[in-house]
Amino acid sequence: MDSEKLFLSGQSMGGYIAASCAPVIQPHGLILLCPGAGMWFGCAQRADGIMQTGKDYADMEGLCYKMAFNYEMAKHPDPFTEAKGYNGPVLLLRADDDRLVDEGTCNRYAQVYTAPVMDTIAGGGHNFATLAARAAVEEKTAAFIKANL
């Protein structure tokens, strides 16, 4: 492994985190799979509402996280501002039937980068949860990495 050619990748919330970290750690390449951003908007207010119910966590499609995460996230600039400053190769993938991350979000991320590669996967939803969608993601990701090594 060449430690100078590491690719940072994240899906959904992980895509938001990867996009936010890339300007700081400057990976060789960045792969964003249906990168989330919508969760940032109003995150502290949502946390307040959940805390008022007596819970200190949220369950988002089986991913449980503490409301402390939302409060910490609220301290940061919006996702698109925070993603600025990374100028390496970027791959943005989204399923055409994703109901959590819309095409506009991917387009806003794309505007941050110099020359992103954007593609849409047929079906599979937010988690690319069909064999065909998963295979397409793996194929496009592998091709992107090979092209940028």
Summary of predicted features, one role per range:
Residues 1-11:
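Alpha/beta-hydrolase fold nucleophile elbow
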Residues 1, 17-18, 31, 101:
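Hydrophobic aliphatic residue packing
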Residues 145-149:
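Short, hydrophobic alpha-helical segments
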Residues 25-108, 114-120, 125, 131-138, ...:
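The alpha/beta-hydrolase serine catalytic core
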Residues 21-22:
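Aromatic pocket-lining residues of Rossmann-like dinucleotide-binding sites
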Residues 10-14, 18:
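Gly/Ala-rich beta-loop-alpha elbow adjacent to hydrolase catalytic centers
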